[in-house]
Swiss-Prot record:
Protein localization: Cell membrane; Cytoplasm
Pfam families: Ig_3, TIR
Catalysed reactions listed for this entry: NAD(+) + H2O = ADP-D-ribose + nicotinamide + H(+)
Domain notes for this protein: The TIR domain mediates NAD(+) hydrolase (NADase) activity. Self-association of TIR domains is required for NADase activity.
Transmembrane parts of this sequence: 362-382
Disulphide bridges: C54-C121, C167-C219, C270-C337
The protein's name in its UniProt record: Interleukin-1 receptor accessory protein-like 1-A
SMART domains linked: IG (SM00409), IGc2 (SM00408), TIR (SM00255)
Source organism per UniProt: Danio rerio
Topological domains, Cytoplasmic: 383-701
Glycosylation sites: N64, N125, N141, N216, N267, N334
Region (Required for synaptic vesicle accumulation during synaptogenesis): 568-701
């Protein structure tokens, strides 16, 4: 009875163990109970010792190896020829050196790569049989490392809190009652640990975990001439949160309203932040009203998988997208995004409404864009070629200007003539333009009828009245602003007569101002600006030197635009206007700058004997001028000589100084003969002048 007690105890233990591990039990083969593969795996690096214990004595039966032997049970070891359980097994033959059997375990001193596989221990006698298998993994170190990443243990530490890292599975290498001598490494390197990291017999204690503590920690133990290493990977997380997740978009506290066009595709993305809450996965989902999206019948509406946008120390930002392929009326309404963890739930709402449809939006925008582009192009062309376009229109569709049909001339030409002492010199370019080129082109090429005072003025009354009458007979007033004209204040002629001044101010006559040079350096330039301000109907045209003489230049186009329209009577070739070249200006005569002075001198031919030599000399010079410049008309007056030294009252038109027009006489150094002449005729308004007076008189027309 006493001998049966151990057997009964073993059988009772087996029955209890069977009831406890019924889930893991694989079955019975040949009358032997097979517990398949034990969950505990033995992992070792190549060259390290390892001990594999029979798992039957550590959770499957309530007996140890000694008790099993005492009741006649024997323990046998097998190795599977394959990697899978149930493959052909063969008994292990122990050589007693590198591989040996010791009680309920087998030792490898050391383990080699070919030792990896399944090892089965079988406890049996003639009436009882039980079997279980264990797994052995043998691996080499990683390149340049002291561990293999597949054989690592893992631990987690919270930021700012303490963490203990143990040296696992070294019980078989330490004698009972002894403290193991362990050396710790981080990333296979010896460390100078900070003060908050402590080493004990089999622990590495970190008092305050930091982010830079993440890494591989290796403990090394010397056993029987062999090194035993265990490596643990420490990951650091944020402190365990006690807060519910936070929705980033849409806003939790504000309803997001969206107007969407029917038939269009809609994507709504919800983003949420989850603090570290252990190994619990974040939960985010969409609902419409009280319905989950997956419970809705429409296949057009779906939500994506939860995606991790970013993650740091266990804290995650995740997103989930709600997609509606083709929005319909039934899809309009309120949609809610929910995010929850073990600490609570948050939600954000989106209201989807119908957008007012804009028909042909793209076509309309494209059409408007094309129209605006065309308008901008047309405005640019008009701005750059405005004069050319207006002239072209006027040439093809316009009639001749009927404004001022009762006027005989198209324009009155006001200009400045050159002094007599400059007669033998080459005319300046501006004077040549004003006296030669401008009248010739306007009359011969464009067919305009100009009133040129040197040529067309017939004295009928006073000088100012004649000028006023001639200006009234013209549709335009052309003022050629040469430096000489500005210096002499040529516009004073039009300011002296009130009727002329009123015409300029009121706009009864249109004025064309031709600037022939940069006049800013001229002393009277400020008066020129005041003149421009006082004229109501004013057009300013700039002559830029010889380059403006070409018929196709912008100067002539602007001038034609400001002149009354008249169809041209003849054409000219397109080259620079130069009287030295044959062409339309080959017959151009040089304009005499002293024609009226010539007329005055001729009128004084029979004057006082004392004046006769100088007058005769002046007459000869003026005769030469008339021969050279026969283009202009001169006037001869026969004035009888009076013996008493006085001239009879004779109506004579002459060129007077502006000072005389203002009621003053010029003050200069005169001879006694000139003084006597002035005193004798001081009260005569219109007098013939001496040649010297003629040379310094006004030459403004």
């Amino acid at each position: 009875m006493t001998a049966l007690n151990p057997v009964l105890f073993l059988l009772c233990g087996v029955s209890v163990s069977l009831s406890l591990k019924v889930v893991s039990k694989r079955g019975s083969v040949d009358g032997c109970t097979d517990w398949s593969v034990d969950y505990l795996k033995y992992r070792v690096l190549h060259g390290e010792p390892v001990r594999i214990k029979c798992a039957l004595f550590y959770g499957y039966i309530r007996a140890n190896y000694t008790q099993a032997q005492s009741i006649g049970l024997s323990l046998m070891w097998y190795r599977s020829s394959g990697l899978g359980h149930g493959d052909f097994e063969e008994p292990i033959s122990f050589d007693g050196t590198r591989m040996s059997k010791e009680e309920d375990a087998i030792w490898f001193r050391p383990a080699e790569l070919q030792d990896a596989g399944l090892y089965s221990c079988v406890l049996r006698n003639s009436t009882f049989c039980m079997k279980v298998s264990m797994t052995l993994l043998v691996a080499d170190n990683d390149t340049a490392g002291c561990y293999n990443s597949k054989l690592r243990y893992t631990e987690k530490g919270e930021l700012g809190k303490s963490k203990d890292i143990s040296c696992p599975d070294i019980q078989d290498y330490v004698q009972p009652g002894e403290k193991p001598q362990i050396t710790w490494y981080k990333e296979c390197n010896v460390q100078q640990w900070r003060s908050s990291v402590l080493q004990t017999a089999d622990l590495l204690a970190i008092q305050d975990v930091r982010e830079d503590d993440i890494g591989n920690y290796t403990c090394e133990l010397l056993f029987g001439g062999f090194l035993v290493r265990r490596t643990t990977y420490l990951s650091v997380t944020a402190p365990l949160t006690e807060e519910p997740p936070r929705i980033l978009f849409p806003s939790e506290n504000k309803l997001l309203a969206m107007d969407v066009q029917l038939g269009s595709m809609l994507n709504l993305t919800c983003r949420a932040f989850f603090g570290y809450s252990g190994d619990i996965s974040p939960l985010v989902y969409w609902m419409k009203g009280e319905k989950f999206i997956e419970d809705m019948d429409q296949s057009r509406i779906r939500e994506s998988e939860i995606k991790t946008v970013r993650e740091h120390l266990g804290e995650q930002e995740v997103s989930i997208t709600l997609t509606i392929d083709s929005l319909e009326e039934v899809d309009l309404g309120n949609y809610s995004c929910y995010a929850e963890n073990g600490n609570g739930r948050r939600q954000a709402n989106v209201q989807i409404g119908k957008r007012v449809e804009l028909m042909y939006t793209v076509e309309l925008a494209g059409g408007l864009g094309a129209i605006l582009l065309l308008l901008a192009l047309l405005l640019s062309v008009y701005k750059c070629y405005r004069i050319e376009l207006l002239l072209c229109y006027r040439h093809h569709f316009g009639g001749e200007d009927t404004d001022g049909d009762n006027k005989e001339y198209d324009a009155y030409l006001s200009y400045s003539k050159v002094e007599l002492d400059q007669w033998g010199q080459e005319l300046q370019e501006e004077e040549r333009f004003a006296l030669e080129i401008l009248p010739d082109v306007l009359e011969k090429h464009y067919g305009y009828k100009l009133f040129i005072p040197d040529r067309d003025l017939i004295p009928t009354s006073t000088y100012i009245e004649d000028v006023s009458r001639c200006v009234d007979m013209s549709k335009r007033l052309i003022i050629v602003l040469t430096p000489s004209y500005v210096l002499r204040r040529g516009w004073s002629i039009f300011e002296l007569e009130s009727r002329l001044r009123n015409s300029l101010v009121s706009g009864d006559i249109k004025v064309i101002l031709i600037e022939c040079a940069d006049l800013r350096g001229v002393i009277n330039y400020q008066e020129v600006e005041e003149l421009k301000q006082s004229i109501k109907c004013l057009s300013v045209v700039h002559w830029n030197g010889p380059q403006s003489n070409k018929p196709g230049s912008r100067f002539w186009k602007q001038l034609r635009y400001t002149m009354p329209y008249r169809r041209p009577q003849q054409t000219i070739t397109n080259h620079a206007l130069d009287t030295s070249e044959p062409g339309p200006f080959a017959d151009l005569q040089t304009v005499s700058a002293i024609s009226m002075a010539t007329a005055t001198s001729a009128a004084l031919a029979p004057a006082h004997p004392e004046l006769r030599p100088s007058l005769r000399s002046s007459y000869r010079s003026h005769s030469l001028a008339r021969q050279k410049h026969s283009h202009y008309r001169s006037y001869d007056y026969e004035l009888p000589f009076t013996a008493g030294g006085t001239l009879p009252p004779q109506h004579t038109y002459c060129n007077l100084p502006l000072t005389l027009l203002n009621g003053q006489r010029p003050v200069n150094n005169k001879t006694l003969r000139q003084h006597s002449l002035d005193e004798h005729h001081g009260n005569n308004a219109m007098l013939p002048l001496l040649p010297r007076e003629t040379s310094i008189s006004s030459v403004i027309w």
